[in-house]
C-alpha cells in the first residue's frame, strides 16, 4: 500500500462520497463507463486498491449489459440503503451503535458539524449520523491539514460501526455488486489511512 498524499485522499473520498450519497445519475454512470475513466481505476490499482478497482471495473461492465443500467442501479441503491434495517444496510451509525457508544458518537458528530459550520441537507433531510455526513467531516479535517485528527476520527467515529455496515451491504438482496464493492473500497481506504 502506497502512502497517499492529501490531494489523493481528498480525490478518493470525494468520489466515494458522491457515489454513495444518492442514486447515480445518467451522467455519473456514463462517466464511470467512459474509457477515459480507466485512468482513475489504474490509479486506484497503483496505490494498492487493485482488487477493489478490478472488481469495480468488472461490475461496471456487467451493469452495461442491462437494458436499463441506471434503473437497475437505482433499484439496488434503494434495496441496499433505503429500506428498513432487516433487508437494507442502513448507512447510519445509529443502526449499528446503541446506548452510551451511540450517544458519545452523535455528540461528537454534532460538535464537528458545529465546528465546520456544516448544515444537514434539508432537501434530503439526512440525519447527522449518515455515512455521507461522516465523510464530509473527514474531508473537512483533511482540507484543514488535520491529519492526526482525521485518523482519530476514522478510528473513533467511523470504524466503531462501519465494519458492521460493510458486512451488511454484502448480504443485501440486490442484482449488482456495485454498491457493496464501493463500500469495500471505502473500508479499505479508511483502514489504510
From Swiss-Prot:
One of its GO terms (biological process) is protein folding. Coiled coil: none annotated. Pfam families: Nitrate_red_del. GO terms for cellular component: cytoplasm. It comes from the Bacteria. The keyword Transmembrane does not apply. Its main location: cytoplasm. It is found in: Cytoplasm. InterPro entries: Chaperone_TorD, DMSO/NO3_reduct_chaperone, HscB_C_sf, TorD-like_sf, TorD/DmsD_chaperones. Keywords: Chaperone, Cytoplasm. Belongs to the TorD/DmsD family. TorD subfamily. PANTHER family: CHAPERONE PROTEIN TORD, CHAPERONE PROTEIN YCDY. Involved in the biogenesis of TorA. Acts on TorA before the insertion of the molybdenum cofactor and, as a result, probably favors a conformation of the apoenzyme that is competent for acquiring the cofactor. This is Chaperone protein TorD. It comes from Actinobacillus succinogenes (strain ATCC 55618 / DSM 22257 / CCUG 43843 / 130Z). The lineage of its organism: Bacteria, Pseudomonadati, Pseudomonadota, Gammaproteobacteria, Pasteurellales.
